[in-house]
């Protein structure tokens, strides 16, 4: 009787040990990242990528998907060009190496974790937002009046991250946030900055 009880205890302990090993192995493989206010994991990429070397094969790029239709594709949380190289945030907007903005989109189709800005004669709203260094950011701009608005960052490091919208139009762009710091942005339409169309992106 005691032998049977001892065998059951040993078998139970062995099963428990196997379960613990499996759980620990799974936790070790999971790459946990920061979590947004909505509870979704924030997607982070290294900020020191070699932007001249492809990080994907042509086949992998074909399989990659954009966060929203019309923006550049994303592979392993890195925004990439059609040739598989990480995009450059410091080139001319709209160039092949730059992150691409969408055509006009329905704002209701934007991902829930997008940074959604509106632009009007009253300025940008919100005029300040925070992201993490390397974070995959989808930034949208909606004109809520009958004017054109062009969001540009002052820092040349982000010269390619630009969104231009027509009256009552929404467009978006996806990019990886730069290193930590404060990055002012403004509306580049003549006269709009002087009336207060400006803001700041804070990268932590």
Regions found by a protein language model. Name each.
Residues 21, 35-36, 41-110, 166-204:
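Extracellular/periplasmic metallocenter environments
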Residues 23-34:
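Sec-dependent signal peptide cleavage junction
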Residues 126-129, 159-165, 173-174:
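Beta-strand-rich interaction surfaces with strong enrichment in secreted/lumenal proteins
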Residues 144-167, 194:
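Histidine- and aromatic-enriched segments that form or immediately flank copper-ligand environments
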Residues 121, 141-143, 177, 191:
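Non-cytosolic beta-sheet module surface loops
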Residues 106-136:
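N-terminal edge beta-strand
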Residues 1-20:
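Membrane interfacial helix-start segments of signal peptides and signal-anchor transmembrane helices
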Residues 114, 136, 148-150, 182:
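Exposed beta-strand and adjacent loop surfaces of beta-rich binding modules
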């Amino acid at each position: 009787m005691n032998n049977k009880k001892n065998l059951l205890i040993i078998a139970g302990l062995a099963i428990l040990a196997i379960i613990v090993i499996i759980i620990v192995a799974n936790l070790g493989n999971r790459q946990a990242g920061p979590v947004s206010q909505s509870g979704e994991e924030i997607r982070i990429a290294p900020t020191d990528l070699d932007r001249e070397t492809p990080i994907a094969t042509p086949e992998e790029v074909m399989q990659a998907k954009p966060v929203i239709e019309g923006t550049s594709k994303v592979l392993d949380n890195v925004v990439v060009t059609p040739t598989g190289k990480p995009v450059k945030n410091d080139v001319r907007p709209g160039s092949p190496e730059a992150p691409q903005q969408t055509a006009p989109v329905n704002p209701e189709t934007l991902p829930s974790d997008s940074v959604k800005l509106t632009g009007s004669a009253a300025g940008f709203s919100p005029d300040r937002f925070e992201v993490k260094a390397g974070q995959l950011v989808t930034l949208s701009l909606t004109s809520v009046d009958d004017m054109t608005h062009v969001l540009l960052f002052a820092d040349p490091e982000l010269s390619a991250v630009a969104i231009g919208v027509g009256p009552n139009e929404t467009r978006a762009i996806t990019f990886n946030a730069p290193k930590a710091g404060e990055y002012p942005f403004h509306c580049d339409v003549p006269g709009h900055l002087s009336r207060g169309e400006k803001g700041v992106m804070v990268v932590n």
